[in-house]
Amino acid sequence: DVFRPGDPAGTLYYVISGSVSIIAEEDDDRELVLGYFGAGEFVGEMGLFIESDCREVILRTRSACELAEISYERLHQLFQGPLAPDASRLLYAIGSQISKRLLHTSRKASRLAFLDVSDRIVRTLHDLAGEPDSMSHPQGTQLRVSRQELARLVGCSREMAGRVLKKLQTDGVLHARGKTVV
């Protein structure tokens, strides 16, 4: 993990390569994946705009990653100095990413409230098919996702995710084997 709840907040990260996930964790160790982020995305940007002493979520690498980091304090100094001409463009890019995440989170909250587990899994698999680390396959799109990870994405148990995948496979909607879903 790059950071965990309770860790000091004071750094903005930029994903140069690889993929990371943001995860909310409950006291009983249950986890909900809030989102995946890849190359070209900022992570940990909240502290630029609201004061917070500590992190509230987990930032976990999903693959080999290269991350750039800069302290909020140093970035604010650069905005007042050498980066002043580019500050509005950079802040707009960060704001745009935050807006997309808010939209994604709103959709996820709606799904949790209004859809059953089966529909949440189908929609989540559809969303994952649009991610950069999905692969083209003769029968559609190949995803590499464990049942545990899928459960964390949709807010259900690993067993329930497995049952739904099995039913979807029986219905001919997809093919699942191990961590591979087509």
Predicted stretch roles:
Residues V2, S19-A24, F42, E66-L67:
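Short beta-strand segments in beta-sandwich/barrel cores
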Residues V33-G95, L103:
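Cyclic-nucleotide recognition modules
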Residues S96-S99, L103, V122-G130:
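Amphipathic, well-packed alpha-helical segments that form the structural scaffold of globular domains
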Residues P8, R111-S118:
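Conserved phosphate/pyrophosphate-binding and hydrolysis machinery centered on Walker-type P-loop NTPases
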Residues L12, L34, L67-A68, Q142, ...:
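A residue-level structural signature of the nucleotidyltransferase/glycosyltransferase Rossmann-like core
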Residues V117, T124-V182:
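Phosphate-/nucleic-acid-contacting segments
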Residues D1-S17:
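Regulatory nucleotide-sensing modules
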